[in-house]
Protein backbone atom coordinates (compact mmCIF):
# COMPACT_ATOMS: atom_id res chain seq x y z
CA UNK A 1 0.00 0.00 0.00
CA UNK A 2 3.05 2.25 0.41
CA UNK A 3 1.85 4.21 3.44
CA UNK A 4 4.33 6.37 5.36
CA UNK A 5 4.73 5.36 9.04
CA UNK A 6 2.60 8.25 10.31
CA UNK A 7 -0.36 7.25 8.12
CA UNK A 8 -0.54 3.51 8.89
CA UNK A 9 -3.69 3.84 11.00
CA UNK A 10 -5.70 4.64 7.88
CA UNK A 11 -5.91 0.87 7.26
CA UNK A 12 -8.56 0.64 10.01
CA UNK A 13 -10.33 3.89 9.14
CA UNK A 14 -13.28 2.30 7.32
CA UNK A 15 -12.94 -1.17 8.82
CA UNK A 16 -14.91 -1.39 12.11
CA UNK A 17 -13.99 -5.05 12.71
CA UNK A 18 -10.26 -4.47 12.57
CA UNK A 19 -10.58 -1.17 14.40
CA UNK A 20 -12.08 -3.16 17.27
CA UNK A 21 -9.31 -5.74 16.91
CA UNK A 22 -6.44 -3.28 17.30
CA UNK A 23 -8.08 -1.72 20.36
CA UNK A 24 -8.46 -5.14 21.99
CA UNK A 25 -4.79 -5.81 21.22
CA UNK A 26 -3.88 -2.49 22.82
CA UNK A 27 -5.77 -3.52 25.96
CA UNK A 28 -3.87 -6.82 25.91
CA UNK A 29 -0.55 -4.96 25.81
CA UNK A 30 -1.52 -2.59 28.64
CA UNK A 31 -2.82 -5.37 30.87
CA UNK A 32 0.13 -7.61 30.05
CA UNK A 33 2.58 -4.85 30.92
CA UNK A 34 0.82 -4.20 34.24
CA UNK A 35 0.89 -7.88 35.24
CA UNK A 36 4.48 -8.42 34.11
CA UNK A 37 5.70 -5.25 35.80
CA UNK A 38 3.99 -6.31 39.02
CA UNK A 39 5.73 -9.69 38.95
CA UNK A 40 9.10 -8.02 38.27
CA UNK A 41 8.62 -5.60 41.16
CA UNK A 42 7.59 -8.42 43.49
CA UNK A 43 10.76 -10.30 42.49
CA UNK A 44 13.02 -7.39 43.52
CA UNK A 45 10.95 -5.91 46.39
CA UNK A 46 12.28 -6.29 49.94
CA UNK A 47 9.34 -6.13 52.40
CA UNK A 48 11.50 -6.53 55.53
CA UNK A 49 11.58 -2.87 56.66
CA UNK A 50 8.38 -0.95 55.86
CA UNK A 51 9.57 2.03 57.96
CA UNK A 52 13.05 2.84 56.60
CA UNK A 53 12.89 0.96 53.29
CA UNK A 54 9.27 1.32 52.10
CA UNK A 55 8.07 0.60 48.57
CA UNK A 56 8.60 4.17 47.37
CA UNK A 57 12.25 4.18 48.49
CA UNK A 58 12.77 0.98 46.48
CA UNK A 59 11.33 2.52 43.31
CA UNK A 60 8.17 0.41 43.17
CA UNK A 61 5.67 1.83 40.69
CA UNK A 62 2.71 -0.57 40.36
CA UNK A 63 2.80 -2.03 43.90
CA UNK A 64 1.62 1.30 45.42
CA UNK A 65 -1.38 1.39 43.07
CA UNK A 66 -2.40 -2.15 44.02
CA UNK A 67 -1.94 -1.33 47.70
CA UNK A 68 -4.10 1.80 47.65
CA UNK A 69 -6.95 -0.30 46.19
CA UNK A 70 -6.79 -2.79 49.05
CA UNK A 71 -4.11 -5.40 48.22
CA UNK A 72 -1.74 -5.87 51.17
CA UNK A 73 -0.67 -9.54 51.25
CA UNK A 74 1.67 -11.69 49.19
CA UNK A 75 1.74 -15.40 48.42
CA UNK A 76 5.31 -15.14 49.71
CA UNK A 77 3.87 -14.91 53.22
CA UNK A 78 4.58 -11.23 53.88
CA UNK A 79 2.29 -8.27 54.40
CA UNK A 80 2.96 -4.71 53.32
CA UNK A 81 2.72 -3.57 56.95
CA UNK A 82 5.68 -5.75 57.88
CA UNK A 83 3.96 -8.77 59.44
CA UNK A 84 3.56 -12.30 58.13
CA UNK A 85 0.39 -13.88 56.71
CA UNK A 86 -0.57 -17.53 56.45
CA UNK A 87 -3.58 -17.30 54.12
CA UNK A 88 -3.28 -14.35 51.73
CA UNK A 89 -6.16 -15.57 49.52
CA UNK A 90 -6.48 -15.29 45.77
CA UNK A 91 -6.36 -11.47 45.68
CA UNK A 92 -2.75 -11.14 46.72
CA UNK A 93 -0.17 -9.08 44.80
CA UNK A 94 0.70 -12.16 42.75
CA UNK A 95 -2.99 -13.00 42.24
CA UNK A 96 -3.73 -9.56 40.81
CA UNK A 97 -0.63 -9.75 38.57
CA UNK A 98 -1.68 -13.20 37.33
CA UNK A 99 -5.23 -12.01 36.64
CA UNK A 100 -3.86 -9.21 34.46
CA UNK A 101 -1.69 -11.62 32.50
CA UNK A 102 -4.58 -14.08 31.97
CA UNK A 103 -6.81 -11.21 30.88
CA UNK A 104 -4.05 -10.04 28.53
CA UNK A 105 -3.91 -13.49 26.92
CA UNK A 106 -7.68 -13.60 26.42
CA UNK A 107 -7.61 -10.12 24.85
CA UNK A 108 -4.76 -11.25 22.59
CA UNK A 109 -6.86 -14.17 21.31
CA UNK A 110 -9.92 -11.95 20.91
CA UNK A 111 -7.87 -9.44 18.91
CA UNK A 112 -6.70 -12.18 16.54
CA UNK A 113 -10.27 -13.47 16.14
CA UNK A 114 -11.60 -10.00 15.30
CA UNK A 115 -8.73 -9.39 12.87
CA UNK A 116 -9.55 -12.61 10.97
CA UNK A 117 -13.34 -12.27 11.20
CA UNK A 118 -13.56 -8.56 10.47
CA UNK A 119 -16.52 -8.57 8.08
CA UNK A 120 -19.32 -9.11 10.61
CA UNK A 121 -22.96 -8.44 9.94
CA UNK A 122 -23.21 -6.22 13.01
CA UNK A 123 -20.87 -3.68 11.39
CA UNK A 124 -22.89 -3.40 8.17
CA UNK A 125 -25.52 -0.79 7.48
CA UNK A 126 -28.51 -2.87 6.33
CA UNK A 127 -29.64 -0.08 3.99
CA UNK A 128 -26.38 0.30 2.06
CA UNK A 129 -24.57 -2.96 2.83
CA UNK A 130 -21.44 -0.95 3.62
CA UNK A 131 -19.52 -0.99 6.92
CA UNK A 132 -20.75 1.71 9.29
CA UNK A 133 -21.01 2.37 13.01
CA UNK A 134 -23.81 4.14 14.87
CA UNK A 135 -21.38 6.30 16.84
CA UNK A 136 -23.92 8.20 19.04
CA UNK A 137 -25.43 4.85 20.09
CA UNK A 138 -21.97 3.39 20.83
CA UNK A 139 -21.20 6.52 22.87
CA UNK A 140 -24.35 5.93 24.94
CA UNK A 141 -23.42 2.28 25.55
CA UNK A 142 -19.89 3.14 26.66
CA UNK A 143 -21.07 5.99 28.88
CA UNK A 144 -23.63 3.72 30.54
CA UNK A 145 -21.09 0.94 31.17
CA UNK A 146 -18.48 3.40 32.48
CA UNK A 147 -21.14 4.84 34.79
CA UNK A 148 -21.98 1.37 36.14
CA UNK A 149 -18.29 0.65 36.81
CA UNK A 150 -17.78 4.05 38.44
CA UNK A 151 -20.87 3.71 40.64
CA UNK A 152 -19.96 0.14 41.58
CA UNK A 153 -16.43 1.15 42.59
CA UNK A 154 -17.67 3.98 44.81
CA UNK A 155 -20.68 2.20 46.30
CA UNK A 156 -19.15 -1.25 46.85
CA UNK A 157 -15.33 -1.38 46.64
CA UNK A 158 -14.50 1.87 48.47
CA UNK A 159 -17.22 1.55 51.11
CA UNK A 160 -16.31 -2.05 51.90
CA UNK A 161 -19.86 -3.17 51.13
CA UNK A 162 -18.43 -5.68 48.67
CA UNK A 163 -14.70 -5.17 48.58
CA UNK A 164 -11.73 -4.33 50.79
CA UNK A 165 -12.01 -0.54 50.98
CA UNK A 166 -9.01 1.67 50.17
CA UNK A 167 -5.78 2.78 51.85
CA UNK A 168 -6.47 5.45 54.47
CA UNK A 169 -3.87 7.17 56.62
CA UNK A 170 -3.38 10.07 59.03
CA UNK A 171 -2.00 13.45 57.84
CA UNK A 172 1.56 12.39 58.75
CA UNK A 173 1.54 8.99 57.04
CA UNK A 174 2.07 6.93 60.20
CA UNK A 175 -1.03 4.78 60.72
CA UNK A 176 -2.05 3.85 57.17
CA UNK A 177 -4.08 0.73 56.51
CA UNK A 178 -6.76 -0.56 54.17
CA UNK A 179 -10.23 0.17 55.52
CA UNK A 180 -13.80 0.79 54.44
CA UNK A 181 -14.65 4.44 53.74
CA UNK A 182 -18.09 5.97 54.17
CA UNK A 183 -19.22 8.51 51.56
CA UNK A 184 -19.06 12.15 52.64
CA UNK A 185 -21.84 14.26 51.15
CA UNK A 186 -21.07 17.62 52.79
CA UNK A 187 -18.73 20.38 51.66
CA UNK A 188 -15.78 18.56 53.27
CA UNK A 189 -16.15 15.91 50.56
CA UNK A 190 -14.52 18.40 48.18
CA UNK A 191 -11.36 18.50 50.30
CA UNK A 192 -8.81 16.49 48.26
CA UNK A 193 -7.41 15.00 51.47
CA UNK A 194 -10.74 13.58 52.71
CA UNK A 195 -11.07 9.89 51.67
CA UNK A 196 -14.87 9.99 52.01
CA UNK A 197 -14.99 12.24 48.96
CA UNK A 198 -13.60 9.40 46.83
CA UNK A 199 -16.63 7.23 47.62
CA UNK A 200 -19.22 9.99 47.23
CA UNK A 201 -17.73 11.39 44.03
CA UNK A 202 -17.63 7.96 42.37
CA UNK A 203 -21.24 7.31 43.38
CA UNK A 204 -22.34 10.73 42.09
CA UNK A 205 -20.30 10.58 38.86
CA UNK A 206 -21.42 6.99 38.24
CA UNK A 207 -25.07 7.92 38.68
CA UNK A 208 -24.63 10.83 36.28
CA UNK A 209 -22.87 8.55 33.78
CA UNK A 210 -25.67 5.96 33.92
CA UNK A 211 -28.35 8.62 33.38
CA UNK A 212 -26.36 10.30 30.59
CA UNK A 213 -25.75 6.93 28.93
CA UNK A 214 -29.46 6.11 28.97
CA UNK A 215 -30.19 9.57 27.56
CA UNK A 216 -27.81 9.09 24.64
CA UNK A 217 -29.23 5.62 23.98
CA UNK A 218 -32.80 6.87 23.83
CA UNK A 219 -32.42 10.32 22.23
CA UNK A 220 -30.93 10.87 18.78
CA UNK A 221 -28.79 13.99 18.24
CA UNK A 222 -30.40 16.79 16.16
CA UNK A 223 -29.32 16.73 12.52
CA UNK A 224 -27.59 20.13 12.64
CA UNK A 225 -25.62 19.15 15.74
CA UNK A 226 -24.79 15.77 14.21
CA UNK A 227 -23.40 17.44 11.10
CA UNK A 228 -21.80 20.38 12.92
CA UNK A 229 -19.78 18.17 15.28
CA UNK A 230 -19.15 15.56 12.57
CA UNK A 231 -20.72 12.83 14.72
CA UNK A 232 -20.59 10.38 11.84
CA UNK A 233 -16.81 10.59 11.55
CA UNK A 234 -14.66 8.15 13.53
CA UNK A 235 -11.96 10.83 13.85
CA UNK A 236 -14.41 12.85 15.97
CA UNK A 237 -14.44 9.92 18.39
CA UNK A 238 -10.64 9.87 18.38
CA UNK A 239 -10.42 13.60 19.06
CA UNK A 240 -12.91 13.63 21.94
CA UNK A 241 -11.41 10.47 23.46
CA UNK A 242 -7.96 12.06 23.45
CA UNK A 243 -9.51 15.11 25.17
CA UNK A 244 -10.91 12.93 27.95
CA UNK A 245 -7.57 11.18 28.43
CA UNK A 246 -5.38 14.30 28.48
CA UNK A 247 -7.75 16.03 30.90
CA UNK A 248 -7.59 13.03 33.25
CA UNK A 249 -3.78 12.94 32.91
CA UNK A 250 -3.47 16.62 33.89
CA UNK A 251 -5.75 16.06 36.91
CA UNK A 252 -3.84 13.04 38.23
CA UNK A 253 -0.49 14.77 37.65
CA UNK A 254 -1.76 17.48 40.00
CA UNK A 255 -3.18 15.16 42.66
CA UNK A 256 0.08 13.18 42.65
CA UNK A 257 2.51 16.12 42.82
CA UNK A 258 0.57 18.24 45.32
CA UNK A 259 -0.73 15.26 47.28
CA UNK A 260 -4.26 14.01 47.97
CA UNK A 261 -6.16 11.20 49.67
CA UNK A 262 -5.66 9.13 46.50
CA UNK A 263 -1.84 9.39 46.70
CA UNK A 264 -0.89 8.53 50.31
CA UNK A 265 2.68 9.38 51.34
CA UNK A 266 3.18 5.89 52.79
CA UNK A 267 2.78 4.43 49.29
CA UNK A 268 4.24 7.14 47.04
CA UNK A 269 6.55 9.06 49.38
CA UNK A 270 6.17 12.62 50.71
CA UNK A 271 5.61 15.66 48.47
CA UNK A 272 8.20 18.38 47.93
CA UNK A 273 5.90 20.91 49.63
CA UNK A 274 6.08 19.01 52.90
CA UNK A 275 9.83 19.68 52.92
CA UNK A 276 9.42 23.29 51.74
CA UNK A 277 6.93 24.05 54.54
CA UNK A 278 8.74 22.13 57.28
CA UNK A 279 5.57 20.06 57.64
CA UNK A 280 7.09 17.07 59.46
CA UNK A 281 9.61 19.22 61.35
CA UNK A 282 6.76 21.23 62.90
CA UNK A 283 4.94 18.05 63.94
CA UNK A 284 8.13 16.63 65.46
CA UNK A 285 8.76 19.83 67.46
CA UNK A 286 5.10 19.86 68.57
CA UNK A 287 5.40 16.32 69.89
CA UNK A 288 8.67 17.12 71.67
CA UNK A 289 7.09 20.23 73.24
CA UNK A 290 4.14 18.14 74.41
CA UNK A 291 6.57 15.63 75.93
CA UNK A 292 8.47 18.36 77.77
CA UNK A 293 5.15 19.75 79.04
CA UNK A 294 4.50 16.29 80.53
CA UNK A 295 7.79 16.62 82.47
CA UNK A 296 9.72 14.25 80.22
CA UNK A 297 13.42 14.91 79.77
CA UNK A 298 14.67 16.15 76.39
CA UNK A 299 16.10 12.70 75.74
CA UNK A 300 12.83 10.94 76.62
CA UNK A 301 10.75 13.37 74.53
CA UNK A 302 12.93 12.84 71.43
CA UNK A 303 13.04 9.08 71.99
CA UNK A 304 9.23 8.99 71.64
CA UNK A 305 9.38 10.38 68.09
CA UNK A 306 8.50 7.54 65.65
CA UNK A 307 11.39 6.68 63.34
CA UNK A 308 8.91 6.77 60.46
CA UNK A 309 8.05 10.43 61.18
CA UNK A 310 11.72 11.38 61.50
CA UNK A 311 12.49 9.67 58.18
CA UNK A 312 9.87 11.75 56.35
CA UNK A 313 11.75 14.84 57.61
CA UNK A 314 14.81 14.11 55.45
CA UNK A 315 15.55 15.90 52.17
CA UNK A 316 16.57 12.66 50.45
CA UNK A 317 12.86 11.71 50.43
CA UNK A 318 11.88 14.91 48.63
CA UNK A 319 10.77 13.90 45.09
CA UNK A 320 11.98 17.23 43.66
CA UNK A 321 15.61 16.50 44.64
CA UNK A 322 16.06 13.78 42.03
CA UNK A 323 17.32 14.89 38.62
CA UNK A 324 15.03 14.34 35.65
CA UNK A 325 17.34 11.83 33.98
CA UNK A 326 18.75 10.09 37.05
CA UNK A 327 17.41 6.58 36.60
CA UNK A 328 16.87 4.24 39.52
CA UNK A 329 15.23 4.15 42.91
CA UNK A 330 15.94 6.43 45.86
CA UNK A 331 17.90 3.57 47.44
CA UNK A 332 20.24 3.68 44.43
CA UNK A 333 20.94 7.32 45.22
CA UNK A 334 21.72 8.05 48.86
CA UNK A 335 21.54 4.40 49.92
CA UNK A 336 19.32 2.19 52.06
CA UNK A 337 18.39 3.84 55.36
CA UNK A 338 19.53 1.67 58.27
CA UNK A 339 18.72 3.72 61.35
CA UNK A 340 18.04 7.18 62.80
CA UNK A 341 21.09 8.60 64.55
CA UNK A 342 18.94 10.89 66.68
CA UNK A 343 18.26 14.63 66.72
CA UNK A 344 21.38 16.81 67.06
CA UNK A 345 21.09 19.94 69.20
CA UNK A 346 23.90 22.45 68.75
CA UNK A 347 24.96 24.93 71.46
CA UNK A 348 27.54 27.68 71.58
CA UNK A 349 29.83 28.31 74.57
CA UNK A 350 27.21 30.65 76.10
CA UNK A 351 24.78 27.72 76.13
CA UNK A 352 22.45 29.12 73.44
CA UNK A 353 20.66 26.49 71.38
CA UNK A 354 21.51 26.85 67.68
CA UNK A 355 19.52 25.67 64.67
CA UNK A 356 21.07 24.71 61.33
CA UNK A 357 19.42 26.46 58.40
CA UNK A 358 17.99 23.78 56.13
CA UNK A 359 18.77 23.37 52.44
CA UNK A 360 15.98 24.57 50.12
CA UNK A 361 14.69 22.06 47.58
CA UNK A 362 16.42 23.39 44.47
CA UNK A 363 19.90 23.87 45.94
CA UNK A 364 22.64 21.31 45.42
CA UNK A 365 24.99 23.11 47.83
CA UNK A 366 24.12 25.52 50.62
CA UNK A 367 26.19 27.39 53.22
CA UNK A 368 26.21 25.88 56.72
CA UNK A 369 24.67 28.56 58.93
CA UNK A 370 23.60 28.16 62.57
CA UNK A 371 21.11 30.65 64.01
CA UNK A 372 19.64 31.12 67.48
CA UNK A 373 15.92 31.03 68.26
CA UNK A 374 15.59 34.70 67.21
CA UNK A 375 17.11 33.99 63.80
CA UNK A 376 20.41 35.75 64.53
CA UNK A 377 23.43 34.08 62.93
CA UNK A 378 25.71 32.76 65.68
CA UNK A 379 27.95 30.27 63.86
CA UNK A 380 28.83 29.00 60.39
CA UNK A 381 31.32 26.99 58.40
CA UNK A 382 33.16 29.82 56.60
CA UNK A 383 34.37 29.80 53.01
CA UNK A 384 37.37 31.95 53.93
CA UNK A 385 38.84 31.11 57.28
CA UNK A 386 40.98 34.28 57.31
CA UNK A 387 37.89 36.51 57.49
CA UNK A 388 35.68 34.31 59.66
CA UNK A 389 34.00 35.57 62.82
CA UNK A 390 31.48 32.81 63.43
CA UNK A 391 33.43 29.62 62.75
CA UNK A 392 32.63 26.55 64.84
CA UNK A 393 36.09 26.80 66.41
CA UNK A 394 35.72 30.52 67.31
CA UNK A 395 32.21 30.20 68.70
CA UNK A 396 32.91 26.91 70.49
CA UNK A 397 29.93 24.98 69.12
CA UNK A 398 29.12 21.56 70.60
CA UNK A 399 26.51 19.00 69.56
CA UNK A 400 24.49 16.52 71.61
CA UNK A 401 22.13 13.85 70.27
CA UNK A 402 18.67 13.09 71.66
CA UNK A 403 16.75 9.96 70.65
CA UNK A 404 17.92 7.52 67.99
CA UNK A 405 21.12 5.47 67.98
CA UNK A 406 23.37 8.23 69.39
CA UNK A 407 21.00 9.19 72.24
CA UNK A 408 23.00 10.98 74.96
CA UNK A 409 26.23 11.19 72.94
CA UNK A 410 27.87 14.62 72.67
CA UNK A 411 30.79 15.96 70.62
CA UNK A 412 32.92 19.07 71.03
CA UNK A 413 35.56 18.25 68.41
CA UNK A 414 35.09 20.96 65.70
CA UNK A 415 35.55 18.55 62.77
CA UNK A 416 32.83 16.22 64.10
CA UNK A 417 30.52 19.11 64.98
CA UNK A 418 30.89 20.51 61.44
CA UNK A 419 30.18 17.07 59.95
CA UNK A 420 26.86 16.81 61.78
CA UNK A 421 26.02 20.46 61.07
CA UNK A 422 26.40 19.75 57.35
CA UNK A 423 24.22 16.67 57.62
CA UNK A 424 21.60 18.63 59.59
CA UNK A 425 21.06 20.81 56.52
CA UNK A 426 19.38 17.77 55.00
CA UNK A 427 16.92 17.25 57.87
CA UNK A 428 17.05 14.43 60.38
CA UNK A 429 20.26 12.40 60.26
CA UNK A 430 20.17 8.76 59.17
CA UNK A 431 22.76 6.05 58.77
CA UNK A 432 22.66 5.03 55.10
CA UNK A 433 24.01 1.82 53.55
CA UNK A 434 25.52 2.74 50.19
CA UNK A 435 27.53 -0.44 49.73
CA UNK A 436 24.74 -2.99 49.15
CA UNK A 437 23.36 -1.39 45.97
CA UNK A 438 26.57 0.49 45.08
CA UNK A 439 24.59 3.70 45.59
CA UNK A 440 26.30 6.76 44.12
CA UNK A 441 25.21 9.33 46.72
CA UNK A 442 23.25 11.43 44.21
CA UNK A 443 19.58 11.93 45.13
CA UNK A 444 16.87 10.21 43.07
CA UNK A 445 13.20 11.05 42.73
CA UNK A 446 10.41 8.86 44.07
CA UNK A 447 7.62 7.24 42.01
CA UNK A 448 5.63 10.39 42.84
CA UNK A 449 8.02 12.40 40.68
CA UNK A 450 8.10 9.87 37.83
CA UNK A 451 4.32 9.58 37.70
CA UNK A 452 3.87 13.36 37.65
CA UNK A 453 6.50 13.91 34.96
CA UNK A 454 5.13 11.12 32.76
CA UNK A 455 1.49 12.14 33.03
CA UNK A 456 2.11 15.89 32.64
CA UNK A 457 4.29 15.25 29.57
CA UNK A 458 1.85 12.88 27.88
CA UNK A 459 -1.07 15.15 28.77
CA UNK A 460 0.64 17.96 26.88
CA UNK A 461 1.31 15.71 23.87
CA UNK A 462 -2.26 14.42 23.93
CA UNK A 463 -3.57 17.99 24.15
CA UNK A 464 -1.89 18.71 20.82
CA UNK A 465 -3.24 15.39 19.50
CA UNK A 466 -6.75 16.50 20.43
CA UNK A 467 -6.32 19.82 18.63
CA UNK A 468 -4.82 18.06 15.58
CA UNK A 469 -7.52 15.42 15.16
CA UNK A 470 -10.31 17.80 16.14
CA UNK A 471 -9.21 20.23 13.44
CA UNK A 472 -8.89 17.40 10.90
CA UNK A 473 -12.43 16.21 11.50
CA UNK A 474 -14.07 19.65 11.73
CA UNK A 475 -12.31 21.05 8.66
CA UNK A 476 -12.03 17.83 6.68
CA UNK A 477 -13.82 19.29 3.67
CA UNK A 478 -11.48 22.29 3.61
CA UNK A 479 -8.37 20.12 3.84
CA UNK A 480 -9.57 17.60 1.26
CA UNK A 481 -11.17 20.11 -1.07
CA UNK A 482 -14.42 18.13 -1.15
CA UNK A 483 -17.70 19.78 -0.25
CA UNK A 484 -19.42 17.31 2.15
CA UNK A 485 -22.82 18.36 0.74
CA UNK A 486 -21.77 17.75 -2.87
CA UNK A 487 -24.27 15.29 -4.36
CA UNK A 488 -22.69 15.08 -7.80
CA UNK A 489 -20.52 12.10 -8.63
CA UNK A 490 -16.87 13.03 -8.09
CA UNK A 491 -14.37 11.45 -10.43
CA UNK A 492 -10.91 11.48 -8.89
CA UNK A 493 -8.21 12.65 -11.30
CA UNK A 494 -10.54 14.72 -13.51
CA UNK A 495 -9.84 17.98 -11.73
CA UNK A 496 -6.63 19.46 -10.35
CA UNK A 497 -8.56 20.16 -7.15
CA UNK A 498 -10.94 17.32 -6.36
CA UNK A 499 -14.57 18.24 -6.97
CA UNK A 500 -13.83 21.73 -8.31
CA UNK A 501 -15.05 21.91 -11.97
CA UNK A 502 -13.17 25.18 -12.55
CA UNK A 503 -9.83 23.35 -12.34
CA UNK A 504 -10.36 20.76 -15.07
CA UNK A 505 -7.09 19.12 -16.08
CA UNK A 506 -5.83 19.75 -19.61
CA UNK A 507 -5.94 16.56 -21.71
CA UNK A 508 -2.45 15.36 -22.61
Swiss-Prot record:
It is a multi-pass membrane protein. The chain crosses the membrane at residues 21-36, 101-115, 140-156, 203-218, 237-252, 457-472. Coiled coil: none annotated. Pfam families: PSII (PF00421). Its main location: plastid. It comes from the Eukaryota. It is found in: Plastid, Chloroplast thylakoid membrane. The keyword Metal-binding does not apply. GO terms for molecular function: chlorophyll binding; electron transporter, transferring electrons within the cyclic electron transport pathway of photosynthesis activity. The keyword Transmembrane applies. GO terms for biological process: photosynthetic electron transport in photosystem II. GO terms for cellular component: chloroplast thylakoid membrane; photosystem II; plastid. Keywords: Chlorophyll, Chloroplast, Chromophore, Membrane, Photosynthesis, Photosystem II, Plastid, Thylakoid, Transmembrane, Transmembrane helix. Binds multiple chlorophylls. PSII binds additional chlorophylls, carotenoids and specific lipids. One of the components of the core complex of photosystem II (PSII). It binds chlorophyll and helps catalyze the primary light-induced photochemical processes of PSII. PSII is a light-driven water:plastoquinone oxidoreductase, using light energy to abstract electrons from H(2)O, generating O(2) and a proton gradient subsequently used for ATP formation. PSII is composed of 1 copy each of membrane proteins PsbA, PsbB, PsbC, PsbD, PsbE, PsbF, PsbH, PsbI, PsbJ, PsbK, PsbL, PsbM, PsbT, PsbX, PsbY, PsbZ, Psb30/Ycf12, at least 3 peripheral proteins of the oxygen-evolving complex and a large number of cofactors. It forms dimeric complexes. Belongs to the PsbB/PsbC family. PsbB subfamily. PANTHER family: PHOTOSYSTEM II CP43 REACTION CENTER PROTEIN. This is Photosystem II CP47 reaction center protein. It comes from Oryza sativa subsp. indica. The gene is psbB.
Amino acid sequence: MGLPWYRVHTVVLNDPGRLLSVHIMHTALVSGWAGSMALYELAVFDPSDPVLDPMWRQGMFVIPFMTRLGITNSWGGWSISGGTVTNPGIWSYEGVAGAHIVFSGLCFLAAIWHWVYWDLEIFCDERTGKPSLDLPKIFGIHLFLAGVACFGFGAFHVTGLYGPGIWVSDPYGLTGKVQAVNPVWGAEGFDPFVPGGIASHHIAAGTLGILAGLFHLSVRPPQRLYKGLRMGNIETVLSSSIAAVFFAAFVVAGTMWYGSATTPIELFGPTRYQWDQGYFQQEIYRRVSDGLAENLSLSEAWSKIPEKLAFYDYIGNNPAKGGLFRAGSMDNGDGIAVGWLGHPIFRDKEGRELFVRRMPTFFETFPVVLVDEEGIVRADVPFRRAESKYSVEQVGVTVEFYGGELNGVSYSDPATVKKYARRSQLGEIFELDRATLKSDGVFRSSPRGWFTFGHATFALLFFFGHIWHGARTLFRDVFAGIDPDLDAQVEFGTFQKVGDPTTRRQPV
